[in-house]
Amino acid sequence: MKRIIKTIAFVASALAVIGCAKAVQTGPNEANERYFNAWIGLNHPGISPTGLGIYVIEEEAGTGNVVKDDGFVYADYIITDLEGNITSYTDKETAKQLGTYDTTTYYGAKVLTTTKNTIYAGLADAIVGMKAGGRKKVIIPSWLMTYSSYDKKEDYLKNSSSGVNTIYDITIRDYTDSIQLYEISQIEKYIKDNPQIFDSRMVNDTTGFYFQPLSKDISTEKFEEDTTIYINYTGRLLNGLVFDTTIEKVAKDNGLYSSARTYGPTKVNWGKELSDLTLGSSNSSVIDGFARTLWHMHPMEKALGIFYSPLGYSFNGSGASIPGYSPLIFEIEIVAKPED
């Protein structure tokens, strides 16, 4: 009953302020501001805004690296609208609760940039200054859900924005000034933690790229230009999530099997330079790290290539399985040509 009365009261007050907004318009966010203020007054009476005009409703201090305004944040978050509807999230538990869990989707911290014009102004206002390990639940008005940056907080109200009122429940996992060095440190930790895979034969001849032979007996023969070879491969993230494979059993074991796909060795078209390598009958281009792994290989060899995101999918990532700024691992085996 209280919830119904509260809702009726808010609707009444919102209609009143919107009515006033029709009579007096002083800027593109006049009605939005009145509506937002009415919602705050009803749901969080007595709370005061901070910074540019955000409202912190829960906060837990961290003890790790301090988030600065020109770097990269690893963060977990749940995003909702003012009604509590979840619009985005990073964790597996929320996906399961919503019935949207998918074994092929990456769940975990994602990278946010804190450089101006690359992050919502209100979100940057909330997280810059936090420390890794800290958590904050914050309400951000629609006019601060913009990538634009202004000198004064009043200027955000004066400029139109397509943003919506948003609630972030965000936890800072880590912060770095250099995402590339951070990725390299992630790779080197993975190598250190897996001595059963990496040995003295490992090659690191390019920044952010590591090649590890897996075969015991390796030919010294190299492939000639215009050669066609066949490979099986499996691609993984550092956390073990398999995002692509040519091997049917691996696909089934990792929940990404598709009956619409034909599994088995795929063709690689060799070239004069590693940038010339293409995949399949359609001559599809391949990411740099994948090509570099192949370029180090010899006939009938099995090997592993591990590389940072500038040699992979960079800041964009790829689909739901590969978030931006992700180091990748490819296990590749050169095999005989399949029989027709």
Q: Each predicted region: which residue ranges?
A:
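Cross-family detector of peptidyl-prolyl cis-trans isomerase
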Residues: 20-340
